[in-house]
């Protein structure tokens, strides 16, 4: 079973796998552990990753990058509107209202959803993992930013399904970093001790995330998160791009932003310049040849000037840091360490801002690029039954408060209740109780839209079906279970109706008003399968939840007044009936469409595979032409006649011309046939050359064998002690085989020496190998017979038996030795225990 963690980044992706030796970040086909989040669409296939990155400028309109933030977003979303101007490719509104990506693929215009494009990237990462692991990859853990909303998370989950992956968990990037940090720490405080608080700062290419985590031995608890969803490395790149656009506009009279290819080239150069400035404070040049209209451009920049230009961006570093401390009510002194990850944290000014805020040195014990994917792989190993990993519990948080709204018959309007507060533990379940006579709808939404980096606070609508009144016409008790799951996705996971069956019992005491109130009071039960500490509800929450009944508290008093005052207490039996729930999720892809996307992805993978095979077949022909042409005038020259060489060379030249003309775009089989045709002419020449190389070595080996056996025969005839135990008949057999082999070798050597090198050899290397094997199998068993052992005289054996070991210490130890043996250390069970985990 494979265990894979995927860091799905805005600019680049990483894949880590868990193996017996530990967690390993794997390299792609270019021997690079970083795979660009880039897809290029061509007339016959798709290029994904590094191959697509090289086409960003040459195939700008059909090369897609920076699509991560379009997940779960409508085309009319303000974020999408703002991004349009930065994109080289076109985005369109899909029939569902979501953002689609428009490209030309297979010679026709196609609109792909963000989920489909992400699935293409995931398929590539899956293929990379499979090529390293040499087995299928299905189970994985994928990272997402901690600020992703429900719609965005569901969108990424759909993308994993399209790619044929089973995502065990969508893991917040900061939580993955915290896991990678904490699981290997041996010095964490015990569970009963005060936890160690660590701040994790992750500034990547597109976003800035901060989290505070509390660590105890075997336990990680996220306390709070904060973020700036648009502050990242690309914002610093944009500052440089805008500066040079303005400078080159004045200096060279160029309107750079009017040409997307020029803008892309400038962006690439500015990113390189930014990285150089992180290591150098001196003036650095930026030069681009034939930039626009065949004009060469150049400029300079230094770190000091760059930081002045970035003052507005640097001012945005502190607020999230301050926010997490305020949310957790921690002081700066309570923070044990500040770990930084992400490419943009390498900018010296960013590091300085963070360090100055906390008043301490920053910790860089984690790999800034690979920490997220390593954390995801560790989480996958924890979830997988195939690996034994030390116990480590992870409690995440809900980033935004989630509320439910419903129509309240008693209040003749809508009621609402906050079910999960900001930074509530997750995954988490709660059971809400409603009193209803008919089906009802719950509307889930984020209750603080001002904190949401998303225009629509709605999450989903959940309709609880088949609710009926009790047999006496009263409202039924409906228990609804709401949950934030391991992916951070909210759902109404189940609903059940409590059926009450009553039978009058005269001897039972009368029901009091107090009993009725107690029955109605309990409205919210909390289930906590993944969280160790029970969270207490605040009075405000209790108040809100007590209003979930059909009537308010005042209404319940009125209701009791309508009942007969002398009603006898009934013997109550209850049973529960599961109720169906209809979900209306925001921007959710329906199952039928998802299956279509899965089918289309399979077709595109097959098309890519066929095109790769076709290209490989074409390249094989081209490679063979160049190889044979060089060798015909080189090492193969002596092994082909002049006429044959001339005709073959002409054939090779014709094939080369054909490849660049009529053979430019042919089916795979045409190239396979063409290569076979060339090999029919070239293979005999190649074989003659190989035979001339191998034959002398093998004849030499055969000669050595013959010489060795002749010496042994001579020694036997001279009656030397070493061979006097051998049988004369057997040695005659050896002599006969050796003489036959010598005669065969001399005969073949003479014939071969008379044969021209341009002709096929008289004897092939395989025949010589067979002769060596035949000679060895006949002679070796005979000459390697060991001499028979000579038994010593009986008297000597008797004396040897009488001479026992000194002091009686021999094979049978005496009582003293046995006593000593009892004191020797025996390995205890604890010493024999397996290590806690098999991942270093």
Swiss-Prot record:
Query: One of this protein's Pfam families, by short name?
Result: HSP70
Q: Where in the cell is it found?
A: Cytoplasm
* Residue list for modification Phosphotyrosine: 89, 336, 660
Which parts of the sequence carry N6-acetyllysine?
A: 53, 430, 679
Keywords, A to Z, come to: Acetylation, ATP-binding, Cytoplasm, Methylation, Nucleotide-binding, Phosphoprotein, Stress response
- What molecular functions are annotated in GO for this chain? adenyl-nucleotide exchange factor activity; ATP binding; ATP-dependent protein folding chaperone
Q: Cross-referenced CDD domains, in alphabetical order?
A: ASKHA_NBD_HSP70_HSPA4 (cd11737)
Q: Name one GO cellular component term.
A: extracellular exosome
Phosphothreonine: residues bearing it: 538
Question: InterPro entries annotated for this entry?
Answer: ATPase_NBD, Heat_shock_70_CS, HSP70_C_sf, HSP70_peptide-bd_sf, Hsp_70_fam, HSPA4_NBD
A Gene Ontology annotation in the biological process aspect, one of them, is: protein import into mitochondrial matrix
**Disordered: annotated segments:** 500-575, 779-840
Where N6-methyllysine occurs along the chain? Answer: 773
The chain residues annotated with the modification Phosphoserine are 76, 393, 415, 546, 647, 756
Residue spans of biased composition, Basic and acidic residues class: 514-533, 788-799, 829-840
Q: How does it assemble?
A: Interacts with TJP1/ZO-1.
- List the PANTHER family: HEAT SHOCK 70 KDA PROTEIN 4 (PTHR45639:SF6), HSC70CB, ISOFORM G-RELATED (PTHR45639)
Q: Which family does it belong to?
A: Belongs to the heat shock protein 70 family.
Descriptive protein name: Heat shock 70 kDa protein 4
